[in-house]
Amino acid sequence: MKASDLLVRCLENEGVEFLFGLPGEENLDVMDALLNSRIRFVATRHEQGAAFMADVYGRLSGKAGVCLSTLGPGATNLLTGVADANLDRAPLVAITAQASLDRRHKESHQYIDTLSMFKVVTKWNAEIARPQIIPEAVRKAFKVAQTEKPGATHLELPEDVAAEQVGAVEYSKPLRVQLPFKPEPLGGQVKRAVQVIAGARRPVILAGNGVIRGRAHEAVRRFARSLNIPVAQTFMGKGIIPDTDALSLYTLGLQARDYPARVFEQADVVIAVGYDFVEYAPCFWNPNGDKHVVHVDVSPAEVDAHYIVEVGVLGDIALCLDQIGASLSPSDALWARRCREAIVTGFEQELASPPAWPLRPQHVIRELRAALSAEDIVICDVGAHKLWMARMFPCEAPNTCIISNGLAAMGIGVPGAIAAKLLSPQRRVVTVTGDGGFLMNSQELETAMRLNLPLVILVWRDDGYGVIRWKQQLRFGRTSSVDFTNPDLVSFAESFGAAGYRVTESSELRSVLADALNCGRPAVIDCPVDYSENLKLTERLKSLT
C-alpha cells in the first residue's frame, strides 16, 4: 500500500464524504487512490472555490470540510478560503501537495514554503515527511479542526512521500476517532451567574455562532422563554431564536446605532452566549465598558477593555444554560416586550413604502423570504447586501442563512451554495450575492452545472462595490474607483447552460424567483437594486432617540 492510499483510507475513517479541489501533477498519487474510495471528489474551477466549499460544508455539518490542491499556485489559491474558515470558526482540513524532498534544498519549479504560508491562517499545520506518520497527522488535523474554537488545519504531502510504500503493518491503519465529551460547568460559576442575573433589572442575551456550533439553540430558547429575557443574535448566529419569537431582537452587528443597539444601551446585564469578538467587537455594544457581563461558552473570554467579565461559566453551552436557568425566576416581561416592539416598529416603517424601481433592499428581502420555506438555505456573499440580509432576513432555524462575518471574504456565495446543495440535496438553496462577489467565483457555475445541482444565484446588481461606495460617501462625501460594468448576466448564465433571468420591474421578482426555484437547474437572477437606501438608512439610524 502506498502512502497516498493510506491517506485516503484515513480520510474515509474520519467520515469524509466530499473532497473539494483540483488535480495536479504533484498530487497524482492521491488522485489515483481516490478512484478506489467512497469519497466523492468534487473538481472545482479554482482552488479558492474548493476552499470555500469546504468552509461552508464545515459550517453546516459541524464536520471538517476537506480541500485539496497541488503545490505552489494551487496552494496559494486555497489560502483565502482557508483563512475564511479559520476566522468563521468552520472546521476545515486543507491538504496540499509539495515538491519532492530531494529538490527542496535548492531553487525548484513551483516550490514555495507552503508551511510558513499556511501557519498564519490555520490552528495547526504539518508536513507529512514519512508515510508512517500519516495516521497520526490526519487524526490530529481533524481533531484540532473540530475542537472549540474550530477552524482550519493544513497538511502538506510531498510528491515522493505520497508515492512511497508504507512499511510496517502497525503504521498502515487509521487511528480510532474519539468523540469529544461535553464538559460540565463548575458549580461556583453557575451560582455566581445566578446571582448576577437575579440582580439585573434589564438583562439581555447576546447569542453568537458558538451556540449553533454547540447545537445549543434549543437551550437558548428555553432559557430566554423561561426567564423573559430578550435575545439578540450576531450575524453568524441567525436562527438561534426565531425572528418571529416575542423575545427576538433580530441581529446585532451593524456598525451603526441600529434598532437592537438601543436595547443594549439600556441593558445593565449582558449574557453573552457563544459570542465571538471576531464578528462584532464589544466596543460597539459596551462603549463605556460598564455592563455586567456573564460569559457562557466552552472557551474562556478574550481580553478586552470593553468586555470585563463579571463571571465566566465554561462548559457545554446547553448544560450551562440549563443549570443557570434552573435557579432563576422570570424577569419582568414588560422590559422584553418594549424592546421587541421598538425594533419591530422600526422595521415595519422601513417596509411601509410601496415597492420602487430599482428595487429597494428591504423589498428584495421580503420577496425572497416569501419564496422560501423555513428550512431552505440561503448563502449570503459579502457586500452591502450582507448587511441588509443580516438585519432583515427573518430566520426560524439555525444554519438557514449562512453569513461569513469573520474574515468576510467576497466570493463565498456560489461555492458555498454548491456545498450546501451537496450536503442537503432535498432543500432549496439560494445564494444572495452582489455583482462584485458573484464575478469573483462565477466560474463555479460550471461546477454546479456539471454536478446537476439546481440552485439559485440572486445577484443584487448596482454596477459597483456597494458597501465601499456607502462608506466613502459617509466619510468623504464622494467616491473613488468603486464603479464597474457587468456582462449581460442572463447571457453569461446561459453560456454555461444555466437558466438566466432578469427582473425588469418591481412586480416581477416574486414570479421570477418562483420560476428560478422550479426550473430544475442552476439559475442566475439579475436583480437591479437601489443602494441609495444605504445612505437613507444611515440617516434614519442617526435620528433615533
Model-inferred region functions:
Residues 132, 168-169, 289-386, 506-515, ...:
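Phosphate/pyrophosphate-binding active-site segments
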Residues 6-16, 56-61, 86, 144-149, ...:
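Glycine-rich phosphate/diphosphate-binding loops that line cofactor/substrate pockets in enzymes
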Residues 39, 59, 209-294, 396-426, ...:
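Glycine-rich, anion-gripping cofactor-binding loops and their flanking helix/strand elements
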Residues 7, 12, 27-31, 35, ...:
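Active-site diphosphate/adenylate-binding microenvironment
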Residues 96-137, 237-339, 487, 513:
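Glycine-rich, acidic loop regions that bind phosphate or pyrophosphate groups
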Residues 140, 144-199, 348-351:
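Conformationally flexible catalytic loops at phosphate/diphosphate-handling active centers
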Residues 95, 103-110, 303-314, 318-324, ...:
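Thiamine diphosphate
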Residues 17-20, 40-42, 60-99, 206-209, ...:
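A short, small-residue-rich loop immediately preceding and capping a beta-strand
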